[in-house]
Amino acid sequence: MKIKTRFAPSPTGYLHVGGARTALYSWLFARNHGGEFVLRIEDTDLERSTQQAIDAIMDGMNWLNLDWDEGPYYQTKRFDRYNTVIDQMLEAGSAYKCYCSKERLETLRENQMANGEKPRYDGRCRDGHEHHAENEPCVVRFRNPQEGSVIFDDQIRGPIEFSNQELDDLIIRRTDGAPTYNFCVVIDDWDMEITHVIRGEDHINNTPRQINILKAIGAQVPVYAHVSMILGDDGKKLSKRHGAVGVMQYRDDGYLPEALLNYLVRLGWSHGDQEIFSIDEMKKLFELDVVSKSASAFNTEKLQWLNHHYINSLAPEYVATHLQWHIEQENIDTRTGPQLAQLVKLLGERCKTLKEMAASCRYFYEEFDEFDADAAKKHLRPVARQPLEVVRDKLAAMSDWTAEGVHQAIQAAADELEVGMGKVGMPLRVAVTGAGQSPALDVTVHAIGQARSVARIEKALAYIATREA
């Protein structure tokens, strides 16, 4: 049997982390088994579905590199197909027309709730005894079995059973002629030959209804696997209140797709004590039978730890392609200064996100208007004038501009003045970066460049002169 999975988001908002994890699990399962992965846009909610949301979903999938073999399919383009099947079901008797008014159904619901009963349709139109005009408004309901049970073996949760007596006759076509979500899903999974439906646990209650429809139309029932929800650190369902955002917001916040994928795969799945997984390892190892049925808590610190790992372990040239976007957001002109791959090497250990890296790299490329006040007060004092003059001259005299040469120049200045390296290094750091902290001074000065470094030392000496006056 050829494995075929699908990711079927509703385009009513962004691709959130829960949806991204579901997409990842479906994608990994298909890839592990040499199967196919289908992208389907479930846009039957015409009032809430938007093109902007569709674009956001596509952007998120593409950024995560979750490629699909078929699709994207759109349910709104398949209404004729759904209605054809509904008409066949009406003909076969597995569906029927319901003429009950909204008022009657609301009264029925209120009475049932008042009596402590579960609200459900009472089947008044099920046997079709009443005569109605051909053009009288009606919905179409599925004739759900009234006896027996629906049992399915959830690949994550084990056997789950629902009594058919608990299920009412589901509306499958509204009065306006539009087929309903639960019905469209069934026909799509049938037509697209989906073998494994991997989705959130909020769909468990839909499953018995969908299975009954599949059996009624003679379709193969797929294997189901329902993934547990993601919680915030307070144990409540993850929401905007916890900072839960769309996948692309993580891009905007400076995370690499590899870090987010690694983090998401571990939210409910494990392979021993291993924490770091490459995409190839995920595809090779992922199986549904080890996915936890317990909810997982989202931990931003863990995600940052993974992101820091990938910033420093992936090829700097690759990381630089993602850093470029953040540099552009900071409006930094990088035409003069180090290559971005070199910048990744310089700042990688100090930065947890690419956004942080972009925000802290401007001094490599552009002049700063003033020194950090605290750093200048502490290190650009009159006593620093001579160390800066000596190291300036030695840097200016270098014919071969290398990081090792810069280190030797700083050491030579300290030796000449008979002071520790810090007496030269700290004023030099503030002079060339404008701040009191930076990566290793020799590689920093080297990356800034000879002419720019010497000019900044001159600027620092002028600043010191104003303090001496």
UniProtKB/Swiss-Prot annotation:
Keywords: Aminoacyl-tRNA synthetase, ATP-binding, Cytoplasm, Ligase, Metal-binding, Nucleotide-binding, Protein biosynthesis, Zinc
Motif ('KMSKS' region): 237-241
UniProt xrefs under Pfam families: Anticodon_2, tRNA-synt_1c
Compartment(s) of residence: Cytoplasm
Gene3D superfamilies cross-referenced by the UniProt entry: 1.10.10.350, HUPs
GO cellular component: cytosol
UniProt record, GO biological process: glutamyl-tRNA aminoacylation
Binding site for Zn(2+): C98, C100, C125, D127
GO molecular function terms listed in the Swiss-Prot or TrEMBL record: ATP binding; glutamate-tRNA ligase activity; tRNA binding; zinc ion binding
Motif ('HIGH' region): 9-19
Cofactor: Zn(2+)
Reaction catalysis annotation: tRNA(Glu) + L-glutamate + ATP = L-glutamyl-tRNA(Glu) + AMP + diphosphate
Residue positions binding ATP: K240
Enzyme Commission number(s): 6.1.1.17
Similarity field: Belongs to the class-I aminoacyl-tRNA synthetase family. Glutamate--tRNA ligase type 1 subfamily.
Role this protein plays: Catalyzes the attachment of glutamate to tRNA(Glu) in a two-step reaction: glutamate is first activated by ATP to form Glu-AMP and then transferred to the acceptor end of tRNA(Glu).
Subunit structure comment from the entry: Monomer.
Protein name as catalogued: Glutamate--tRNA ligase
Organism this protein belongs to: Erwinia tasmaniensis (strain DSM 17950 / CFBP 7177 / CIP 109463 / NCPPB 4357 / Et1/99)
